[in-house]
Every structure is written in structure tokens, then in C-alpha cells.
């Protein structure tokens, strides 16, 4: 569902990237990371429904800190893997995961 603010969304969802999505640690189950707010991944555990609990968002007061040196905080405030790094999570904005590495 499209949105411009969280009040446009059904209860329990959050407006992220103009879409109503499941917030971090939200009650709703997810199928893929695209069901979760930007920077949060969907995790499956022992065949249970997916949960939005893998947090790749930048940390700190200014939301500009990434603890993994292979990642950097991009303009979406997501800790994305840098060019040439193995994509164990999202690549930084502008890169895609190809052949297990983040590339332009």
C-alpha cells in the first residue's frame, strides 16, 4: 500500500520508502526483505513465519555509524556492503549483489 506518512498505513505498519511496510520486530510476518522497512531483513527460524528482525540500519545519534568495516552508511541510512565486498547483507545504495560481491 502506498503512503506518505505512517498514519496512512494500517495499524502495525510503518511508512518507509512511500510503502506501508513491517517495522523492525513488528508483529506481522514477512515473506522477503521487501516486506520490511528499508534496512531491515526478513529472517526465518525453524520453519516459522518470517520476522523483520535483521537490522542493517545505521546506528548512533546521527544514524551514521556502521560497526562492520566492510559496510558504510548510505543515503538511506542503511549499512550497505561496499563495492567489491562479499554481500552478506544489502549492498550500499547504487550497488547490486552479483556473483556474491557488491558491484556497480
From Swiss-Prot:
One of its GO terms (molecular function) is toxin activity. Acts as a neurotoxin by inhibiting an ion channel. Expressed by the venom duct. The keyword Lipid metabolism does not apply. It comes from Iotyrris olangoensis. This is Turripeptide OL55. The lineage of its organism: Eukaryota, Metazoa, Spiralia, Lophotrochozoa, Mollusca. It is found in: Secreted. The keyword Zinc does not apply. Keywords: Disulfide bond, Ion channel impairing toxin, Neurotoxin, Secreted, Toxin. Contains 8 disulfide bonds. The cysteine framework is C-C-C-C-C-C-C-C-C-C-C-C-C-C-C-C. GO terms for cellular component: extracellular region. It comes from the Eukaryota. Its main location: secreted.
Amino acid at each position: 500500500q502506498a503512503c506518505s506518512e505512517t498514519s496512512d498505513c494500517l495499524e502495525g505498519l510503518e511508512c518507509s520508502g512511500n510503502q506501508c511496510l513491517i517495522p523492525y520486530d513488528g508483529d506481522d510476518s514477512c515473506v522477503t526483505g521487501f516486506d520490511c522497512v528499508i534496512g531491515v531483513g526478513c529472517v526465518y527460524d525453524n520453519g516459522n513465519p518470517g520476522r523483520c528482525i535483521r537490522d542493517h540500519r545505521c546506528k548512533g545519534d546521527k544514524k551514521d555509524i556502521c560497526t562492520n568495516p566492510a559496510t558504510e552508511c548510505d543515503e538511506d541510512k542503511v549499512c550497505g556492503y561496499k563495492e567489491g565486498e562479499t554481500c552478506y547483507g544489502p549492498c550500499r545504495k547504487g550497488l547490486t549483489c552479483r556473483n556474491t560481491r557488491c558491484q556497480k
